[in-house]
Amino acid sequence: MTILNSLNQFSKGRLSWLLLLLFVVFFEACALYFQHVMMLAPCVMCIYERVAMMGVGVAAIVGLMAPNNPIFRWLGLIGWGLSSYKGLLLAQQHVDYQFNPSPFATCDLFVTFPSWRPLNQWAPWIFEAYGDCSKIVWQFLDLSMPQWLVVIFAGNLIALALIVI
C-alpha cells in the first residue's frame, strides 16, 4: 500500500477529521489569544482569514459526521479545499498590503458581512476589526502573521491534494 493510499484510507476515518478540527480550534484559539491577551488589534483581512479558517472547521465537522459516507466525505473535502483556497488568497493579499504598502491599495476600514449574517454584530469580540492591515505587529521566525497563514493554508491545500489523489 502506498503512502497516498494510506492517506486516502486515513481520511475515511473520524480521527483524520477530528485532527483537522483540532487544528482549526488551535489556530482560532491562537488568534483570540493574540487579540485579547497580547492586545494585538485584528485588521479586516485578519477577520476574513479567521472566517476562512472557520470554514475549514465547518468542513471538518461535516466530514466528522460520517467519514465513510461518500457524500459527507466529499462535502467535507470540497469545503476544506474551498475554505483553504480562499484563506490562501486572503493571506497573500494581506502579505501584499504589508510588504507593498500603497495609499491606493488598502484594505477596507470595516468588515463587511452579508446583512443576513452580520457576524461582527453577533460576536464583535471575535469578528470586529480595528487594526491596520499594512502594519506588521507580530513576527515569528522572521515571518509575519499573514505569512504564516499563507504557509498554513498552503499546507492545508497540499494535505488535501495528497488525500484526494
UniProtKB/Swiss-Prot annotation:
One of its GO terms (molecular function) is protein-disulfide reductase activity. Belongs to the DsbB family. The keyword Cell membrane applies. It is found in: Cell inner membrane. Disulfide bonds join 43-46, 107-133. Residues 34-51, 93-147 are periplasmic. This is Disulfide bond formation protein B. Its main location: membrane. It is a multi-pass membrane protein. Residues 1-16, 68-74 are cytoplasmic. GO terms for biological process: protein folding. InterPro entries: DiS_bond_form_DsbB/BdbC, Disulphide_bond_form_DsbB, DsbB, DsbB-like_sf. One of its GO terms (cellular component) is plasma membrane. PANTHER family: DISULFIDE BOND FORMATION PROTEIN B. The chain crosses the membrane at residues 17-33, 52-67, 75-92, 148-165. Required for disulfide bond formation in some periplasmic proteins. Acts by oxidizing the DsbA protein. Keywords: Cell inner membrane, Cell membrane, Chaperone, Disulfide bond, Electron transport, Membrane, Oxidoreductase, Redox-active center, Transmembrane, Transmembrane helix, Transport. NCBIfam families: PRK01749.1. The keyword Transport applies.
